[in-house]
Amino acid sequence: MLIVQQFQKRSFIIPSLISSGLSYLSKDIRLADKMEDGELHFPKTEFEKSQNTSRPLFQRPEPNYPGHVPLYNFEKLLMFLGSSIGAFVNPTNNNFIVSLGESTAFPWVLNRLRTQMLNDPSGRQILKERPHMTSKSLNLDELKNYPDNSLGKSYFLWLEREGVSPDTRVPVKYITDPELAFVFQRYRECHDFYHTITGLPIVREGEIALKLFEFMNLGIPMTGLGALFAPIPIKSSQRRRLLSVYYPWAVKNGTICKPLINVYWEKIMKKDIDVLRSELGIEKPPDMRELRKKARSKKKQVA
Amino acid sequence: MFQVIRRFATSVSNVADIVIIGGGPAGLTLGTALKNSPVTKHLKIHLVEGGKIIEPLNSFLETPPPNYLNRVVSLTPSTIGFLDSIGAWSHFNQERTQSYDDIVTYDGVSGARMNFEHPDIATMVETTNIQAGLLSRLNELNSQQEVKLVIQEDTKVTSIAKDSITQWPTLKLSNGDSLTCRLLVGCDGYNSPVRHFAGIESRGWSYNRWGVVATFKFADTEFRFPTGWQRFLPTGPLALLPLPNGYTSMVWSTTPELAEMLLSLDETEFLSMVNAGTRLSTEELSMIYDLAKSKSPDLLEQIQWRLNLFAGKLKPADEENFPLQVSEIVTGSRARFPLKLSHADTYVEDRVALVGDAAHTTHPLAGQGLNMGQEDVKSLVGALERATSRGLDIGNSLALEPYFSERWPQNHVLLGVMDKIHKIYSTDFAPLVAARSFGVDVLNSLGPIKDFMVGRISGNSKR
Amino acid sequence: MIRHSRNLIKLQSVRYASTKGKENSATENLRLGYLSDAQNAYMDRVIRVDQAGELGANFIYNGQYLALSHKRPDLKPILKHMWEQEIHHHNTFNNLQVERRVRPSLLTPLWKVGAMGLGIATGLMGKEAAMACTEAVETVIGGHYNQQLRVLTNQFHVDVVNEETGVNTPTVPEEIKDMQKLVSQFRDEELEHLDTAVEHDAHGARPYWLLTEAIKLTCRGAIWTAERV
């Protein structure tokens, strides 16, 4: 009886459950696991000592090409969220568009583009040679002497009219595979040529129309997002013009024309631009700057 | 003079206990096993083969050809155990066999891989080596026994009919003889005349695929343990199986157009194509196929470009996930054969039994076709032994039926499984690819289940 | 505080073991290192799990003896012999646990009940089932002891610095060598039990594969848990 009274009533189940659950985190268990796996105190051979296999737990993977910044998936998601909001609110800041483009350029999209390039002889040549467009590689000084109505001359005139230069393209940083990064870089660099061949200016309205054209032709998600959301904050008269004139044009031409990613622009600079347009299957849309000037003068008249 | 008399006399029918039609691995194994077994060795057995086999097979063992032949099969440990038990394995040219411990199968679209490791999981042996070893053992048994197995080579069977009185199968041979037997065993391949004679239906379908075979030598860049590789492309699996001394036998099951294209390439292009097939993505491969079909002159350059790009992206640790590149081809080893699935409705009829390809044909993706035939032989010999020791008429369905009931369901399951694997891997539809890759990844990490699969395939499972 | 005193005890035992039977001139100038935290943690784990394991084996044989002794008195000697060896193993590890002040497995009551239950159940299923159970358990234990032996042999070096020359020659201390011998001997005895069980128709059990694989799985799970809890 006395012994029974001396026996203390203690809770047993809950504390032992907790301690057995938490014990997994205990240092002893982790150390003993490491011993079992042969990671500690194991005499290393000379070869193994020369291998530096120990890595800290969270280490960024190696860059695959110069300028590559490997991102984790959650970082890419954050970049997408930030850049999509930023591009909507402030589309003139190039960084947002660039980041939005790279964070939405999923591997399967770029893979599809690369397959398109692989199946075309000129596309294959571009993939093999990996040309980069700079003002030097395009020989801007010679372009002004090219025949009128050639692609080179039109490009030069367009550059002058809009006041831009081919050297301002931001290099691709966040795409993992080097070949797919090149494909995206090529798209960025050819963007000015798409302007030239369609004649669209670099005003907001022009960029939006060109985005839809690119989306129908290339399928890059950023262009689709741009075409969908960018017309929301612009002036209603511009939006009306966009939706009635340029969007139908973009849909029609983007779908039926040949994949523009395969065009080796640098090699066809001397070609007549109208011939090129008919070969590719593009009709020139109404000149946007003219339409805008007319609309402005009409408003002035009315006022 | 003897012959003149014979010509004018009514042809005397030879009578045998068992006539085996077909001198391929199945027929020779059956003959050897029957002669080896103390229960059945007294039976009078004739083996009829349409081609000349004795001289070529004997010379194969005496003066082996310098190059490995392109018909090579993968033998399971169970088959080798059986061949050993009938005393034939020791007669094989062992230096020309290659046993390997590792099989790697990987998905052509997603790269999901499965690794099977087991000591001596399979052994590669040339078909001629098998036949030669069996023939050698048969000659040895014949020299030791009174009742000899008669091999009639270069003799075609012109007709098979039922004898009017006894109902026993009677064959008319191309050399004028006629042969009556108690039991007729058809080991005569897919278009088995014996099966047609017995009126047995064989059901199945053509896979609309051709197996392209060739023998290569791996590039001598690094040491690898002999491994069997199989890449499941959407058009069909590409398998590289190890042979001795760094050689490898390739079986590429692919569509008829691609098979024709592969055979039309010259040797260097073919080598590059095979290297591309083991490494490059399906989009790159379809670009390469289109270039090859249109006979583009820069095919080699384009393949080399993509291979170099691939090699540049490959991390050193991942190099062992792909087979070595092939650098030489054994000239004249390129060939192709059509792939089809077929399964006979029954393996036994009154006084008729079917073994091997006459009973079933399958896709080579798991290397089971010949092994199934060997298991058939083992089972049939067991049934005949039991029948003989009980004094039964061996041609009677009662004696033969245990063979059918033992083998048919097992063969059917195996044929079905291989058919499903072929179908699952014949697509590059993204959701299916994701599902099968997930399944493969899960299965690859479940050791016990893989061991079970290996045990079933190699016939080693504990009963 | 407790860790410090434990290390002291370990250090003393290391030093004591090292000077056992060695010549004085050699040992006077040697400074022996401590076993590291990881090595101590692993030793604790070894003793804990082996104590629990031998307790389990003890109770399994106990249960089998109980279940089979009435129906199969011819098996009594062989079961008794194996049981007694397990009792000896269990006692050895009990002593080691107390000596080194290792926490025993918290789930010991569970192991007692489980092992007894397994012994009785397989005993009631018959001789072949009991032998198959023994075979399964001893197979797992054989592999388990082998793994421990591997670690004890390869990874239990301590720094032994010669005070004069300053040269460090990592050596395995004597007590660890004794531990290796113990584990090796016990492993051999367990494998002997396995052979005995196979001799006595373990493969005749029905359902063989299911029974052995289920018992192996349970044993592995129990070993994993006893190592940690």
From Swiss-Prot, chain A:
One Gene Ontology BP term is: ubiquinone biosynthetic process
In what pathway does it function?
Cofactor biosynthesis; ubiquinone biosynthesis
| Coarse class of the protein's main subcellular location | mitochondrion
Q: Name one Pfam family in it.
A: Coq4
Q: How does it assemble?
A: Component of a multi-subunit COQ enzyme complex, composed of at least COQ3, COQ4, COQ5, COQ6, COQ7 and COQ9.
User: What does this gene product do?
Assistant: Lyase that catalyzes the C1-decarboxylation of 4-hydroxy-3-methoxy-5-(all-trans-polyprenyl)benzoic acid into 2-methoxy-6-(all-trans-polyprenyl)phenol during ubiquinone biosynthesis.
Q: What else is known?
A: This protein may be expected to contain an N-terminal transit peptide but none has been predicted.
Q: What is this protein called?
A: Ubiquinone biosynthesis protein COQ4, mitochondrial
Name its species: Komagataella phaffii (strain GS115 / ATCC 20864)
What is the taxonomic lineage of the source species?
Eukaryota, Fungi, Dikarya, Ascomycota, Saccharomycotina
